């Protein structure tokens, strides 16, 4: 028996006790950050995102289509890519009726119109899964209806976010969305602002590796008014 085999044999015979699973979520529940109210938490999230050039519009379930149209027209868009297989995609298309913005369905295989997609599409529109207050972040799930390219390639990304799905921290989002129990989707991504990069001279540039503009339509619950958030938000 070689020295290696001898060592392995001794290890196998040893009375090894199973290691106790660390109480990760209990630790973060105890040590995690919290805010005095929903409004304060939303203000913190908004301040973190606006600090990196994110545009946020506080909207309601009924007002977001109108605000979406106004924001899109304000950017002078010629077209916008919509996930028409979703309810919010259909609502967004209806909001653009009689406007100068052409709604384009995201329904073709990317290889069949790659040149047009990368060269001629002004904006994309998607939903989000949830938000993370501490870091000023949105979590998005890629799906056949809303693939990653919908929010990555166009220079402007409109994102619809239901603030009822706001979590304090990342671990709260993992727990609340049951990512452990249900399995994490193959493509989950966290967005904290438009694409940005810096060269060796530390010159900050937006849009180098993704959208240069991120516009969030943040849907508020009925008991919170947009006016509650605009002051110092």
What is each of the regions a protein language model found here?
Residues 1-233:
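The feature marks the mature, well-folded catalytic cores of soluble enzymes
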